[in-house]
């Protein structure tokens, strides 16, 4: 019986990465409320979000031999969590706090299959070179900053701000492909 992978996400970057990896998938729309719990650690939060997205998607997909993938990304710097910017000044605050500094991108993935949950969190350290106010203005004008955790996309024009990374490029983009492949193997997605 044919196995199906469903992506419980509206992220164009996650779709692009699955296509790049050659993994056939369908989309399922299953949004969840992304609110932290009292005293929840950033790692626990990002992992819980991926699991909730996968479970929500799994509950909307009928049939057997179904694997549903959920994922979430946050950025952590100096104990603060950075999600998507709410407006231009929020994006400015985020990018200027990364300017000339290191921050950590945490991307979680969860796969739900017949009640079993497989999950992982990938952490990548990203080092930015200093960014000027005029560079921020130019970057903001591209529109890239608006829908991304930390107000930047590594695969876009913000790549010129990144001095180096320690970890997974695809995780910074939104979906750690090595960890995804590992979980798909653990969950017997590839088995005949």
Swiss-Prot record:
Its cofactor is a divalent metal cation. Its EC number is 3.6.1.9. It is found in: Cytoplasm. Pfam families: Maf. Keywords: Cytoplasm, Hydrolase, Nucleotide metabolism. InterPro entries: ITPase-like_fam, Maf-like. SUPFAM superfamilies: ITPase-like. CDD domains: Maf. One of its GO terms (biological process) is nucleotide metabolic process. GO terms for cellular component: cytoplasm. The record marks 13, 73, 155 as: Important for substrate specificity. One of its GO terms (molecular function) is UTP diphosphatase activity. It catalyses: dTTP + H2O = dTMP + diphosphate + H(+); UTP + H2O = UMP + diphosphate + H(+). Gene3D superfamilies: 3.90.950.10. Belongs to the Maf family. YhdE subfamily. HAMAP family: Maf (MF_00528). Nucleoside triphosphate pyrophosphatase that hydrolyzes dTTP and UTP. May have a dual role in cell division arrest and in preventing the incorporation of modified nucleotides into cellular nucleic acids. NCBIfam families: maf. This is dTTP/UTP pyrophosphatase. It comes from Hydrogenovibrio crunogenus (strain DSM 25203 / XCL-2) (Thiomicrospira crunogena).
């Amino acid at each position: 019986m044919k196995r199906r992978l469903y992506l419980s996400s509206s992220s164009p970057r996650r779709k692009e990465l699955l296509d790049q990896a050659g993994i056939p998938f369908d989309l399922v729309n299953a949004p969840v409320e992304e609110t932290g719990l009292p005293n929840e650690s950033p790692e626990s939060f990002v992992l819980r979000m991926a699991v909730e997205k996968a479970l929500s998607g799994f509950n909307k997909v009928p049939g057997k031999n179904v694997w549903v993938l959920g994922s979430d990304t946050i950025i952590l710097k100096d104990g603060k969590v950075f999600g998507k910017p709410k407006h231009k000044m929020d994006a400015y605050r985020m990018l200027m706090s990364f300017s000339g500094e290191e921050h950590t991108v945490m991307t979680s993935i969860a796969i739900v299959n017949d009640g079993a949950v497989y999950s992982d969190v990938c952490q990548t350290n990203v080092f930015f070179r200093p960014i000027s106010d005029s560079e921020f203005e130019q970057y903001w004008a591209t529109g890239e900053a608006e829908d991304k955790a930390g107000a930047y996309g590594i695969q876009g024009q913000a790549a010129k701000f990144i001095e180096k990374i320690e970890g997974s490029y695809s995780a910074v983009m939104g979906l750690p492909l090595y960890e995804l492949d590992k979980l798909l193997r653990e969950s017997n997605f590839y088995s005949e």
